[in-house]
Amino acid sequence: MTKFETVRGMKDYIGIDAEKIRYLESTFRDLAIKYGYSEIITPVVEEFKLFALKGGEELRETMYVFKDKADRELSLRPEITPSVARAYIQNLQSSPKPIRLFYFGTVYRYDEPQYGRYREFRQAGIEMIGDSSILADLEVLDLLYNFYDKLNLSNDITIKINNIGIFRKIMDKYNIEDNLQEHILHLIDKNKINEALDILEKNLKNKDIIDFFNKILTKKDTKLEDIESLAELEEVSRLDIKSEFLYLFRLSRILSNLNIKFKIDLGFVRGLAYYTGLIFEVLHPSVQFSIAGGGRYDKLIELYGGLPSPAIGFAIGVERTLLVIKDLKVEEPVNVIVIGMSEDTIPSMFMVSRILRKEEYKVVINTKDQPLSKLLPYYASQGFKVAIIIGKQELEKNMITVRNLITRKQISVPLENIEDAIKQTL
């Protein structure tokens, strides 16, 4: 017989593991709604070009790509931002700005599976489209920080930030084409600094600029006052990037006032090729990889054929976030097992179950044909706290027995007093 298993790099989530994912989803959804964001659900399958156009070298290499029966080249989504951008152009472009959207869904990448890296995983994220202000950037960062605060992780995480506009402006000034810019930034992202500098040297032929690149790429933990000093350098003015440093200074100063823990890393870039300004990642000391990330992508909407529209967003790695949570306690309702002692009690079993489910109890009806002496210890071992026992004699008197399966305390009460009896036995 054929034996089927999960596809490599993908996994099943059962019981408490599934509940943890749903807990993160509901926590994120509740928070995003409180910030004024509306949910968007996009297809898992999109045109390949949607992601390939500005996904970056690494993303293109790891996409699940296939042709359908109409010979269209399609892809399982490797991320969700491009889908949101496409949906915005298709459905929301004429709506009042800014547009605030949030999502939660599965994405797919053909990576080598390892700790913290899967081929199917979940992302929770937001996109704000139509606002280029520093307030928009701060709102997005504040929402991200508050999500981790709700998970009791705000004291552990650090948000790493940079302004990729510094690199973009220099390369635009010297007419380095987009594909080469993408490759250079990809090399920097992979910490292949010397390779990136070699390509820049061949194309810029300007030692001063190469030296400047080298200087900022090595500033991994830059202080606020250093940013202000860098903004005043003559070469910064000459390269027309003073405003990019001043923006980073303003943003960082406000983040400090908001008590959001962050660090400035001028050598930090992100692998996705559509970023134009602020970029950021969430770091946790227990893992070597980021658990969330995002940034500003002011040209993507126009690239997809929409009207020019600034945008910013982030995506949270759900499984990665779960890895860094030491003790996630998902609140569960009280587990109740309803046991009927004869066929005559079946209607009462269902009636009792309906009553308790309306009061948010988790209720299971016993289907095992075994004596009570075996059923009670079995259900106690399965995590049930309360047993409702309905026997023939109780049924005749409209009574039930409520038993605490942990303490073994039990009482018999009229059916209408069932809720009080459960509370009394717990």
Curated annotation (Swiss-Prot):
Record-linked Pfam families: HGTP_anticodon, tRNA-synt_His
Q: Coiled-coil segments, which residues?
A: none
Places the protein is found? Cytoplasm
Please state the protein's primary subcellular location.
cytoplasm
Q: What is its EC number?
A: 6.1.1.21
Instruction: Spell out the molecular function terms from Gene Ontology.
Output: ATP binding; histidine-tRNA ligase activity
Q: Give UniProt keywords alphabetically.
A: Aminoacyl-tRNA synthetase, ATP-binding, Cytoplasm, Ligase, Nucleotide-binding, Protein biosynthesis
Q: Which PROSITE patterns match?
A: AA_TRNA_LIGASE_II
Its UniProt entry gives the catalysed reaction(s) as: tRNA(His) + L-histidine + ATP = L-histidyl-tRNA(His) + AMP + diphosphate + H(+)
> Which cellular components does GO assign to this protein?
cytoplasm
GO biological processes: histidyl-tRNA aminoacylation; L-histidine biosynthetic process
- Give the family per the record: Belongs to the class-II aminoacyl-tRNA synthetase family.
Q: Which NCBIfam families is this protein grouped with?
A: hisS
User: What protein does this entry describe?
Assistant: Histidine--tRNA ligase
Q: Which organism is it from?
A: Saccharolobus islandicus (strain L.S.2.15 / Lassen #1) (Sulfolobus islandicus)
According to the entry, what is the taxonomic lineage of the organism?
Answer: Archaea, Thermoproteota, Thermoprotei, Sulfolobales, Sulfolobaceae
